[in-house]
């Protein structure tokens, strides 16, 4: 068996096209332009690149992009004052604070200062709680992207056995909540799970988000299962730096029914879902119907 390759890059392009279409209609019918504000503190190179990509794609779908680049010495009071202004700005529908923040800033305090309705990363404690209790919320972008791809590939997920390897607040826990919301039977596993391979082999859906390069091999996978690899790891191989996932793609692809590659799988969906969340936030703020197929 050779697994179907789930092309996240192409899927993300489709999501962005849907977002752009909805944005154009919002402008034409209601005179509204969804606005996304991104706050970057410091000069972390990876964050600089990521923020640049977010801004570019925001403009490409017709949204307004507001970038706030602050020095690494910015005080907590200054950052909170900026967030307060963005919370009250009617042109801003989504706010994203790029993590990690410099060590002198309290990330939890900063994230929870956001208006939950504008928290397009879905990290505010209110959104976390609402997701966990099955209420309407802003959903973290990476798990939302995974869910979109699973729905597209498998259709109805009800009754399927799902194993999420990883228990982070950013991916593992919200991914499990989303799968529960689809009526899957969900197991959360992690690096200390006893006989992890046996647990994973029970999964119709296997989501790897443990942060260990190529930890999940073909021996962990039930024949025909759908494997979503969230991992992004840089390793040295043959004298070169290579980007790999948490899944050993070569061995897994011989067993799985479908699998996301790294790169080109889950990664592109994260920014696409950020744009989708910003669109959703704009619609909610203005009492308009939410876009179908772009939310959980």
UniProtKB/Swiss-Prot annotation:
CDD domains: NAD_bind_m-THF_DH_Cyclohyd
UniProt catalytic activity: (6R)-5,10-methylene-5,6,7,8-tetrahydrofolate + NADP(+) = (6R)-5,10-methenyltetrahydrofolate + NADPH; (6R)-5,10-methenyltetrahydrofolate + H2O = (6R)-10-formyltetrahydrofolate + H(+)
GO CC annotation terms, alphabetical: cytosol
Keyword Membrane: no
Residues given in the record as NADP(+) binding sites: 166-168, 191, 232
EC number, UniProt record: 1.5.1.5, 3.5.4.9
PANTHER family in alphabetical order: C-1-TETRAHYDROFOLATE SYNTHASE, CYTOPLASMIC, C-1-TETRAHYDROFOLATE SYNTHASE, CYTOPLASMIC-RELATED
Function: Catalyzes the oxidation of 5,10-methylenetetrahydrofolate to 5,10-methenyltetrahydrofolate and then the hydrolysis of 5,10-methenyltetrahydrofolate to 10-formyltetrahydrofolate.
HAMAP family: THF_DHG_CYH
Name used for this protein in its record: Bifunctional protein FolD
């Amino acid at each position: 068996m050779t697994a179907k390759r789930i092309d996240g890059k192409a899927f993300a392009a489709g999501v962005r096209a849907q977002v752009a279409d909805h944005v154009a209609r919002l402008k034409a019918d209601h005179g509204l332009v969804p606005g996304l504000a991104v706050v970057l503190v410091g000069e972390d190179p990876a964050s600089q690149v990521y923020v640049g990509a977010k801004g570019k794609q925001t403009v490409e779908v017709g949204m307004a992009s507001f970038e706030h680049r602050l020095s690494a010495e910015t005080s907590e009071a200054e950052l909170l004052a900026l967030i307060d202004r963005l919370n009250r700005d009617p042109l801003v529908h989504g706010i994203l604070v790029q993590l990690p923040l410099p060590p002198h800033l309290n990330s939890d305090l900063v994230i929870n200062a956001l208006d939950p309705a504008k928290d397009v990363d879905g990290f505010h404690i209110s959104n976390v709680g609402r997701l966990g209790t099955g209420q309407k919320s802003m959903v973290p972008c990476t798990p939302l992207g995974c869910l979109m791809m699973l729905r597209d590939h498998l259709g109805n997920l009800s009754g399927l056995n799902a194993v999420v390897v990883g228990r982070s607040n950013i991916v593992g826990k919200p991914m499990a909540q989303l799968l529960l919301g689809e009526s899957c039977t969900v197991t959360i596993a992690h690096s200390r799970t006893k006989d992890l391979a046996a647990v994973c082999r029970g999964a119709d859906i296997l989501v790897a988000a443990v942060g260990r390069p190529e930890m999940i091999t073909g021996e962990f996978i039930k024949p025909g299962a759908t494997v979503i690899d969230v991992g992004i790891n840089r390793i040295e191989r043959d004298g070169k730096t290579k980007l790999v996932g948490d899944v050993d793609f070569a061995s897994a692809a011989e067993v799985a029914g479908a699998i996301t590659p790294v790169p080109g799988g889950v990664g592109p969906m994260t920014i696409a879902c950020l744009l989708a969340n910003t669109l959703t936030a704009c619609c909610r703020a203005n009492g308009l119907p939410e876009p179908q197929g772009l939310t959980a």
